[in-house]
Amino acid sequence: MENKLSFEEAISQLEHLVSKLEQGDVPLEEAISYFKEGMELSKLCDEKLKDVQEQMAVILGEDGQLEPFTALGDEA
């Protein structure tokens, strides 16, 4: 699975695959292929969400409050 997909692109592709599978008229081998691709897309989305959670933890700090921002040279 190409990791260069954005979260939104991966979700869109995943929704498309789920829609195809929900129709129920997909041959078994094709359904298995869709399922595998869907699992890869799901993993990619999970990784991207974890990255964002880590970034938010840094921004919010340990106590869940926004950390004060000091621009370079503003340290008084």
UniProtKB/Swiss-Prot annotation:
Its EC number is 3.1.11.6. Its main location: cytoplasm. Gene3D superfamilies: Exonuclease VII, small subunit (1.10.287.1040). It catalyses: Exonucleolytic cleavage in either 5'- to 3'- or 3'- to 5'-direction to yield nucleoside 5'-phosphates. It is found in: Cytoplasm. Keywords: Cytoplasm, Exonuclease, Hydrolase, Nuclease. GO terms for biological process: DNA catabolic process. GO terms for molecular function: exodeoxyribonuclease VII activity. Belongs to the XseB family. Bidirectionally degrades single-stranded DNA into large acid-insoluble oligonucleotides, which are then degraded further into small acid-soluble oligonucleotides. NCBIfam families: PRK14063.1 (NF010666), xseB (TIGR01280). This is Exodeoxyribonuclease 7 small subunit. It comes from Bacillus cytotoxicus (strain DSM 22905 / CIP 110041 / 391-98 / NVH 391-98). The lineage of its organism: Bacteria, Bacillati, Bacillota, Bacilli, Bacillales. The gene is xseB.
